[in-house]
Regions:
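Histidine/acidic residue-rich metal-binding segments in metalloenzymes
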Residues: 134-308
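A glycine-rich helix N-cap at a beta->alpha junction
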Residues: 112-128
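Divalent metal-coordination and catalytic microenvironments
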Residues: 9, 22, 27, 51, ...
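C-terminal cap of metal-dependent C-N hydrolases
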Residues: 9, 323, 377-443
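His/Asp/Glu-enriched, well-ordered alpha-helical/loop segment
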Residues: 201-222, 226-231, 301-308, 313-389
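Histidine-rich, glycine-flanked metal-binding segment
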Residues: 1-5, 10-56
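Metal-associated gating/positioning segment near the N- to mid-region
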Residues: 50-117
């Protein structure tokens, strides 16, 4: 039996910070000990946490690992490597791959592939289309994290735009619907208008005016209405506007059937950053005004925003060239998501307890993940150790995503991920990832 004692830690868990230690027995947390209490049995390995923060591993509910079919940009192995280095111990991957994850055959193939490739834990969304709503009730709710619904066209063109199909999806899903909310008719009209005024590829600075706040608010409002009409479980992804926050309820997660995610990109950048980063920060929905960013940041200290995800979506740098219409949308983010939000903690925008709630606890509760997301005896030992006082600057040579770049290059951070544990195994330490480790399928108790 393998027993590991992580001692001298500042444990951040369930709204509290306390000095203590954790005993890992094989894959699970066996003991959570306060202060100077010693383990009940001898431990073969002892790790001194040096007073650093020890928290549950981050659960990222929103990634695009591009596998299968787009593996020149990324793949499950490379991106799970980046995840481990960033303190992310579990991910949920989106269906806009090639082939799209819109059939049971494609879904099962992704699970089988991840079992051989992924360093961290994993699950996959099933993609709704205009033609597969009848398949949704047959999905294995204990295995599939949710149904992804594109209510706005984005990378992969999986737009569901027929009202009768939308109603059927909300009625038939039987599990969480994760929705990309942008109204396509508004985007199309804006595209036509900006092309007429500025040519075939308007400057990147016009991206947030083409994929506008109005498009987001209209679509999110429609999704909420459909969810309420069908008593469905709706999770609105990547909220990017102050207007959308007005549609949400500020009450505990346990009391809501409609929840919301904010992404690191919309919390970190704003429209002025297009001047320097240009297409590198082009994403859908677009990064908008400083007022929108500030509203999202303020919402982190409330229950309006339930989860912080990444929308990690790698592309090659050459694919990011061009303006508002030719540069592709999406950026890598998973390796630096935790330290980026820790930077907001350092700035007093949210507390570290709130960070752990929105990046660790809430995804586990919201998706009903079995035995993960908390530091509790009997739970899987998915953990991250964070140095709260280490200044460093992101350089290109530290990027582990296959695409080889990050919009965070040149950013100065003041905290650092020191170690990451997945199912009790130390998978990241001393700037190295254990490439031989394999994660597990997430299981859902529904």
């Amino acid at each position: 039996m393998k027993r590991t004692w992580i001692k001298n830690a500042r444990i951040v868990n369930e709204g509290k910070i306390f000095h203590g230690s954790i005993v890992i027995e094989n894959e699970v947390i066996a003991e959570v000990l306060a202060e100077e209490t010693v383990p009940s049995q001898p431990c073969g390995e002892i790790i001194d946490a040096k007073g650093y923060y020890l928290m549950p591993g981050v659960i990222d509910d929103h990634v695009h690992f591009r596998d299968p079919g787009l593996t020149h940009k990324a793949d499950i192995h490379t991106e799970s490597t980046a995840a481990a280095a960033g303190g992310v111990t579990s991910f949920m991957d989106m269906p806009n791959t090639t082939p799209q994850t819109t059939t049971l055959e494609a879904l099962n193939a992704k699970f089988a592939d991840a079992a051989t490739k992924s360093i961290v834990n994993y699950s996959f969304y099933f993609g709704a289309t205009n033609t597969n709503a009848d398949v949704l009730p047959t999905l294995d709710k204990s295995r599939v994290c949710g149904v992804k619904l594109f209510m706005g066209a984005s990378t992969g063109n999986m737009l569901v735009d027929r009202m009768e199909v939308l109603r059927k999806v909300f009625a038939n899903a039987g599990m969480l619907i994760a929705a990309h909310c942008e109204e396509q008719s508004i985007i199309s009209a804006n595209t036509t208008a900006f092309k007429e005024k500025y040519g075939e590829d308007p400057d990147i600075k016009y991206h947030p005016q083409i994929r506008s706040a109005e498009a987001c608010a209209y679509s999110s409002s429609l999704a909420i209405r459909l969810a309420k009409e069908n008593n469905a479980r709706l999770h609105i992804l990547h909220i990017s506007t102050a207007q959308e926050l007005d549609l949400l309820e500020d009450k505990p997660l346990s009391e809501k059937k409609i929840t919301a995610e904010a992404c690191v990109s919309h919390l970190y950048f704003y429209d002025k950053d297009y001047e320097t980063l240009k297409g590198r920060i082009k994403c859908n929905p677009s990064i908008k005004t400083s007022e929108d960013r500030n509203a999202l940041r303020k919402a982190l200290s409330t229950n309006l925003i339930d989860v912080i995800g990444t929308d990690h979506a790698p592309h090659l740098l050459k694919e990011k060239e061009g303006g508002a219409l030719k540069a592709v949308s999406g950026m890598p983010m998973i390796q630096f998501s935790l330290v980026a939000i820790m930077e907001l903690v350092c700035e007093g925008i949210l507390s570290i307890e709130q960070l752990v709630q929105k990046m660790c606890h809430a995804p586990a509760e919201l998706y009903h993940i079995e035995r993960r997301g908390y530091i509790r005896p009997g739970y899987q030992a998915d953990l991250v150790l964070v140095n709260p006082d280490h200044e460093w600057t992101v350089t290109a040579d530290c990027v582990l995503s296959k695409c080889g770049w990050t919009p965070m290059e040149g950013q100065k951070f003041h905290t650092r991920v020191e170690k990451t544990f997945v199912n009790g195994d130390l998978v990241y330490s001393d700037n190295k990832v254990d490439q031989s480790h394999r994660g597990q399928e997430l299981r859902f108790k529904r």
